[in-house]
Amino acid sequence: MAKKIQAYIKLQVKAGQANPSPPVGPALGQHGVNIMEFCKAFNARTQGQEAGLPTPVIITVYSDRSFTFETKSTPASVLLKKAAGLTSGSARPNTVKVGTVTRAQLEDIAKAKQADLTAADLDAAVRTIAGSARSMGLNVEGV
């Protein structure tokens, strides 16, 4: 018989840097999950990713206090800011442009995000990422 699911916890944790401090500790502690076990497993799974990039994770907590988790790819906004060399997007994206990204950069981001996107092919994924870039106040070249 399958285990009974108690809760789903969604967090963004920096790759390779999970530790028991907030937000990880309180979120897992209130469901009775072994926090250090999660931190070690998460850090091991995200070892190949660039350290410090926020990684969305969905933790499934079962009634016997065991857990499983699934990591997603880094949010597109973080990858776009990194590609454009910015610390934040524009406060007024339709009037004030703060940077530029090229189609090649968008293709790299789309390839990294393709597993999490619902796009049918790479070109559709690039257009999706380009829309995110425009909404952040970035100029998009070549799309």
Swiss-Prot record:
InterPro entries hit by this protein: Ribosomal_uL11, Ribosomal_uL11_bac-typ, Ribosomal_uL11_C, Ribosomal_uL11_C_sf, Ribosomal_uL11_CS, Ribosomal_uL11_N, Ribosomal_uL11_N_sf
Keywords: Methylation, Ribonucleoprotein, Ribosomal protein, RNA-binding, rRNA-binding
SUPFAM superfamilies in alphabetical order: Ribosomal L11/L12e N-terminal domain, Ribosomal protein L11, C-terminal domain
PROSITE patterns linked: RIBOSOMAL_L11
One Gene Ontology MF term: structural constituent of ribosome
Post-translational modification as stated in the protein's UniProt record: One or more lysine residues are methylated.
An annotated GO BP: translation
Short name of any one Pfam family annotated for the protein: Ribosomal_L11
Keyword Cell cycle assigned: no
GO cellular component, one term: cytosolic large ribosomal subunit
Function summary: Forms part of the ribosomal stalk which helps the ribosome interact with GTP-bound translation factors.
NCBIfam families: L11_bact
Oligomer and partners: Part of the ribosomal stalk of the 50S ribosomal subunit. Interacts with L10 and the large rRNA to form the base of the stalk. L10 forms an elongated spine to which L12 dimers bind in a sequential fashion forming a multimeric L10(L12)X complex.
HAMAP family in the record: Ribosomal_uL11 (MF_00736)
Family under the similarity heading: Belongs to the universal ribosomal protein uL11 family.
Protein name, as recorded: Large ribosomal subunit protein uL11
Organism of provenance: Pseudomonas putida (strain ATCC 47054 / DSM 6125 / CFBP 8728 / NCIMB 11950 / KT2440)
